[in-house]
Design a protein with these regions (language model features):
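Cell wall/extracellular polymer interaction/catalysis modules
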Residues: 1-136, 143-162
């Protein structure tokens, strides 16, 4: 069962539809780092990252990773660590995963740019939102919808961004 982004603000899985937000500049086939677009394509869901100091009870079949204070996601296209989970390092550009604003209390890593091609986009996740504000390229859901989505995904679920 796949998750499909239909229209620009509806995520659908099975018979469930959830309002969501996407990149501020819409959907684009050839994503470029920093373009504020959500990448078009079909992507495997990888790991579920979560803040265990805030979230303890949830159902999910994906591999889970506890977010720690020193975790980041490298968004420096010139680094060999580009589009990878890293231990925060002052010499690298990164997206911090341990945040105060609750947007990353839960996030699902998708396999966009898994070959780590420089400038092809990094840190594309399904994560939380409070107000459906446009993202830098991710897909964002309200927490209650995210938790329902987690119950529905399987190890074979893909995300289709059309």
């Amino acid at each position: 069962m796949d998750i499909k982004l239909i229209k620009k603000n509806i995520l659908k899985i099975d018979e469930f539809q959830f309002k969501c937000s996407i990149g501020a500049k819409g959907i684009k086939k050839n994503k470029i780092e920093g373009d504020f677009c959500t990448p078009r394509g079909r992507y495997k869901l990888k790991n579920l990252f979560y803040r265990d100091d805030r979230e303890k009870k949830f159902n999910c079949v994906l591999n889970t990773v506890k977010i720690k204070k020193n975790m980041g996601w490298c968004d420096d296209p010139k680094s060999r660590h580009y589009n990878s989970l890293i231990k925060i390092n002052k010499n690298l550009k990164y997206e911090k995963l341990f945040r105060k604003d609750h947007l990353y209390d839960f996030l699902i890593e998708i396999d966009h740019n898994h070959k780590k091609k420089p400038f092809a986009g990094s840190a594309i996740f399904i994560h939380l939102t409070k107000n459906y504000k446009p993202t830098k390229g991710c897909i964002a859901l309200k927490k209650k919808d995210f938790l329902i989505l987690l119950k529905l995904v399987t190890k074979k679920t893909y995300l289709n961004i059309i």
